[in-house]
Structures are given as structure tokens and as C-alpha cells.
Amino acid sequence: MGRMFGTDGVRGVANTELTARIAYDLGRAGAYVLTEGAHKPKILVAKDTRISGDMLESALIAGILSVGAEAIVLGVVPTPAVAYLTRKYGADAGVMISASHNPVEYNGIKFFNDKGYKLSDELEDEIQRVIESDFEGVPSPTGTDLGRETIEVSALDDYIEFAKNTIPYSLKGLKIALDCANGAAYKSSVKAFRELGADVFVINDNPDGTNINENCGSTHPEELMEYVIKKKCDLGFAFDGDADRCLAVDEKGNLINGDFILMLCAKYLKELGKLKDDTLVVTVMSNLGLDIACKNEKINIVKTAVGDRYVLEEMVKNKYVLGGEQSGHVIFLDYNSTGDGLVTALQIAGIVKKKEKALSELCSIMKELPQVLANATIPNDKKDLYLTDDEIQNEIRKIEEALNGVGRVLIRPSGTEPLVRVMLEGENQAEIDEMAHNLANLIEKKYN
């Protein structure tokens, strides 16, 4: 078997690639590996709004109970709520059932340790090893030694209270639009903003099990962009399916991506003397415009591989407090141990309120270089072949020469889908658009 875990847990099409059997095995092996030696360990279990969540949750819980661990069921809450509540409740681990921004037919299972951090590669490999060994040495208790399932009814309110406490003042007077992606944010984000005094307008807050991320949320913010203008809001926020990321929309209906959000928050934290070593952690995918803006503001940048787990690793290692991705995964390490869409949205709203300036004006400190992303659909086992392919490497060199030092080419395999992503930045939008798609087509043609 290849590696089960991708960059964000185990993910696949529910009931074919990610079956109830796999969920049971992950529950059983995960509970064993993460709680070895603990007496009656506690594991939190949560999910987003996908129809397959019920099936996978039941199987996962069965696996957890089968090794004598307790399953504390949180219901539908955002991924960052699991990270926070694992610490708050003193649990031994937490599990989120979600495929984040992916379409409804997908689902995923990701684990958090007792500190609320995603697992290391080594721990994930150990969970897989236990499954592949057919659970050799894993206990199967009987009678009163089996685990019990309990429902934690205050989970959502405990998370909302935590998120609200990350900004110490009211948002009264702000008109805010929220796009909940028919996902895990549909209750928590609305309640938090309303309780802080904001005038809240909401779309896509009616999940039916099948409409998560469907033409809405952070992957499709167009509806929110129009809605902000229609309702004359000061700003808007679009979450993804599990609400661990968010994008913003300014009062003019312009999309504010993760790079702008990071720049805005870094500048504000630096002014308060709270940006450790005046340093921001981002990935290699961040726009070159962010580098330029940070240089102007005397903010240092540290770059990591793509994936919020690598951003987090760097932050934890050097105790940096702010980092994230262009996609809207933003980590405020003083508050939570993972990307948190609600906390991010509250910080932005707080800055707008405190500065008494429009979001468009606050974001004008950064100018974005045109950037194009093109996907090449290729089988998972061929995703790294471009690295040693002379024709493709030659094509990349040609593009780099044409960009003449103002721009770049970045190619990376997706960690969650059978795709290779081709990213180009440069001064001329039409030119880089053509180059990116030509290169993606070449890669796709060669490996299919």
C-alpha cells in the first residue's frame, strides 16, 4: 500500500476510496497510537456538513471505542474548533471528518494530537503501520473496558467564546457579509459576529448535506463579492467547507486573498509590537507583491514548502506568531494551533474597526503581481516525473528567460488530488496566462 496520509490527512471519494472500513481502521489505529498507555483516553470527533460525514463518523467512533477509548462527539464544528477544544477539554487527541474545500463526494479524516497540532509524518506512518500489521498487539477489550460515546453539547459555544475573546472590543457599527459555504461555519461565524455587535448579512448558511462548497465559499467568492455591494457592507468573509480558512471582500466588492490578509495583519501586529522578530511566515506560492510590501514595511519573510503544516512547523520551531497561505489559511499561533477562518475574519474586522479606515485603503499597502495557476490532471504515481523530464525542464527555462527576472515559474504536485499545479507570475497577464496553460497542457499530454 502507498502512503495513506496526504498533506492534510487521509482523503478520497467517500464510500469508494474512503470507506467505512478505512474509517474504522483509522479510528482503531489512531486511538491506539495516540493514546498508548493512557487509561480510558478521550478522543474528540467532529465533522463538516457532508452527507458522508454520518457514515464515516459512525465507523470512526466504532474504531475508537473498540480499543477502550472514549469518543467525545462534537457534531458539526469547524476544524479549528477541534484543535482548540482538544486542548481545552484535556483530550488525548481530536479527529476531524472533512475534505475542506473539495467537492461533496470527497471526504477526509485528519487527526490532532493532545496539543491541538496536526500529526507529524512519523506518527501518521505509525498509524498506517498498525493498520498494515492487521492490528498486531492492539488490545480488543471486552465488557466494562470498552469505550463509551458521549455528546458534548457545549462544544460550539465554547469555541465561539474562545474566538470572540481574540478581539477585545465590540464590532458595533460594522456591516459584515458572511458566506458560510454551506459548511461547518454556518452557525459559529454568524453567532460570533452578531454577539460582538456587528450588523451581519449571511448567504449559504443552509447546509443540506450535498451543497457544501457548491458555487460558494472561499473557492467561489463571486456571489459574496456581489452581495457585499448589494447590501452596502463594510466588508465580507468567505469560509471554506471546514472553516479553517477565509478570504475577505472589501467594501468595493474586491476579493482580498490570503497574501493581502497576511500583510494587513503583519503590519498591524508590528505596530503593536506583537510580531515576533518582525517576521511573517509564508509559502513559496505567495505573490512577489507580498515580498515587496514586506520590504517596504521592514517586515522579514520566511518561506516554506506549500501546505499550512509546513508554515506551522516553521512557526513553532522559531516561535513566530503569524503565518499562512494565499488560499486564506492564516495561523495566529498566539490563539490557535491551526488555520482558523473565524479568528482570521475577526482580526480583520477588528483592524478595520480600530483603524477607522476602509478595508480597500488598508490593503493598498500591497500591489499584487499578475499570477496564473493552471492544473495538469495526471495520475498520482506520475506526479513527480516532470522533475527529470528534459523537454519539460527545457520549456521551464525558456519561460524563465522570457520573464527576464520579473516573475517566476513554480510547479508542484497537489497533495490531495491527481493534479500538478503550474503557477506563473509576471508583469503581463495575457502572456503568463498563455505560458502557464501551454506548460500544463504539455505535462498533461506527456503523462496520460
Swiss-Prot record:
Cofactor binding note of this UniProt entry: Binds 1 Mg(2+) ion per subunit.
Origin superkingdom: Bacteria
Entry cofactors: Mg(2+)
Binding site for Mg(2+): S100, D240, D242, D244
InterPro entries per record: A-D-PHexomutase_a/b/a-I, A-D-PHexomutase_a/b/a-I/II/III, A-D-PHexomutase_a/b/a-II, A-D-PHexomutase_a/b/a-III, A-D-PHexomutase_C, A-D-PHexomutase_C_sf, A-D-PHexomutase_CS, Alpha-D-phosphohexomutase_SF
Residues that bear Phosphoserine: S100
UniProtKB keywords: Isomerase, Magnesium, Metal-binding, Phosphoprotein
EC number: 5.4.2.10
Any single GO BP term: UDP-N-acetylglucosamine biosynthetic process
Catalytic reaction list: alpha-D-glucosamine 1-phosphate = D-glucosamine 6-phosphate
This protein's GO CC annotations: cytosol
Post-translational modification comment from the UniProt entry: Activated by phosphorylation.
Keyword Oxidoreductase: no
Gene Ontology MF terms: magnesium ion binding; phosphoglucosamine mutase activity; phosphomannomutase activity
Residues at the active site: S100
UniProt family annotation: Belongs to the phosphohexose mutase family.
Task of the protein: Catalyzes the conversion of glucosamine-6-phosphate to glucosamine-1-phosphate.
Protein's name in the database: Phosphoglucosamine mutase
Organism: Clostridium beijerinckii (strain ATCC 51743 / NCIMB 8052) (Clostridium acetobutylicum)
